[in-house]
């Protein structure tokens, strides 16, 4: 059985991979970080199930500014509460974007996550994204 430190480290890895996959436009791979019946609840829509999550993420990318500026999602202030094979996670996030004037904060906010252990890995069961820093 993993230690609490190992579980928290694994959860940090999931959150980092989420950002990398989202930034790279690998939405099917991003959705794979959720449970089969996971929910992605954003300011722009809510989706349940991996296919629906990937579809929503893709549609949001297409809807945004074109050509799309290079963006990097950052997650910080991660607080994890473990309860056996479940975890509650709070974090802050920010999107940094390139612009002709230089780097800028595109948006930011907070995430509330419910995660579950799935075999030997952790998955997002529910991710609520609050967006309160807007351009």
Each language-model region and where it sits:
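Short, low-complexity N-terminal intrinsically disordered segments enriched in polar/charged residues
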Residues: 1-32
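A beta-strand edge to alpha-helix "cap/lid" segment located at domain peripheries
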Residues: 63-135
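A solvent-exposed, acidic/Ser-Thr-rich amphipathic alpha-helical stretch
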Residues: 27-93
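Charge-dense, low-complexity intrinsically disordered segments
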Residues: 5, 47, 102
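Residue-level detector of alpha-helix boundaries and kinks
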Residues: 2-3, 15, 38, 65, ...
């Amino acid at each position: 059985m993993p230690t609490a430190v190992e579980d928290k480290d694994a959860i940090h890895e999931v959150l980092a991979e989420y950002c990398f996959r989202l930034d790279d436009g690998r939405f099917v791979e991003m959705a794979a970080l959720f449970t089969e019946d996971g929910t992605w609840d954003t300011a722009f829509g809510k989706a349940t199930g991996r296919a629906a999550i990937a579809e929503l993420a893709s549609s949001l990318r297409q809807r945004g500014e074109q050509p799309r500026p290079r963006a990097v999602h950052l997650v910080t202030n991660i607080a994890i509460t473990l309860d056996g094979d479940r975890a509650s996670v709070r974090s802050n996030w920010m999107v940094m974007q390139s612009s002709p004037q230089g780097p800028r904060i595109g948006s930011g906010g907070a995430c509330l996550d419910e995660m579950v252990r799935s075999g030997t890995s952790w998955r997002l069961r529910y991710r609520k994204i609050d967006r309160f820093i807007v351009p």
